[in-house]
Amino acid sequence: MTTSSRVKALLELTSTDQSTFAAAFGMTTPQAMSNKLRRDSWSAKDLAKAAELCGARLAFILPDGSQLILAPD
């Protein structure tokens, strides 16, 4: 599963509109988000921002259960 597939799944699971999502990334055309999804070009900062927009958090979960949560800042 690609990163873009996971982002699309996150949008679907949280009922987040793709155009609202694109606007939060500063994209003014639907084509810009489509291009990003097609290129599968996501930085850690992008993924943390996507998670935050959908009411989630992006984290590394270690074997001992401790978490390192990535913030979009």
Question: What is the meaning of each model-derived region?
Answer:
Residues K8, D17-T20, A48:
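Residues within the helices of the helix-turn-helix
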Residues M1-T14, I61:
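A short, Lys/Arg-rich alpha-helix, primarily the initiator
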